[in-house]
């Protein structure tokens, strides 16, 4: 198994399965929006604002409409200059744990190949290859 990438910035992702997948690939403080739950969770919103005062935050959501809505909401409540947006490609398929594909037919963060996710985080890793 490859060494997990050490990421200094906290990471926001959508759900617990995304978090589990990321934890297998990176060492970072990983937070979940609980899907659309972030919209009404004022405590979590306040926590994210306080966190943004101290550090930049990486945002990684699914490549579907719901992921875009969540990403835009995060953009609206946090200072844009403190956010690092990572984007996954729209890959057709279904996650192994699901019986049917998602509504839009794309894999979410949890369903993507590990190498693809590692390549997204590599530029921010303390122990990995740097791009640029």
Specify the residue positions occupied by each region the protein language model found.
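A short, flexible N-terminal coil/short beta segment enriched in small residues
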Residues: 1-13
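TOPRIM fold recognition
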Residues: 5, 24, 38-132
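The start of beta-strands in P-loop NTPase/AAA+ ATPase cores
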Residues: 9, 29, 56-57
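Hydrophobic/aromatic beta-strand patches that form the interior of the parallel beta-sheet core
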Residues: 12, 31, 84-87
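Short beta-strand scaffold positions
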Residues: 13-14, 61
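Short, glycine/polar-rich helix-capping loops at beta-to-alpha or helix-loop-helix junctions
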Residues: 16-21, 44
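A short beta-strand-loop structural module common to alpha/beta enzyme folds
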Residues: 28-40
């Amino acid at each position: 198994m490859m060494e997990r990438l050490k990421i200094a910035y906290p990471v926001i992702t959508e759900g617990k399965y995304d978090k589990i997948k990321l934890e297998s690939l990176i060492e970072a403080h990983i937070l979940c929006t609980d899907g659309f739950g972030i919209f009404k969770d004022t405590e979590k919103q306040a926590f994210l604002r306080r966190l943004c005062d101290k550090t930049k935050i990486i945002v990684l959501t699914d490549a579907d409409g719901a992921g875009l809505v969540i990403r835009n909401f995060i953009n609206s409540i946090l200072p844009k200059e403190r956010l690092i947006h990572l984007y996954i490609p729209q890959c057709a398929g279904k996650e192994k744990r699901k019986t049917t594909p998602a509504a839009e037919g794309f894999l979410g963060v949890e369903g993507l190949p590990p190498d693809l996710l590692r390549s997204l985080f590599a530029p921010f890793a303390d122990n990995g290859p740097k791009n640029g």
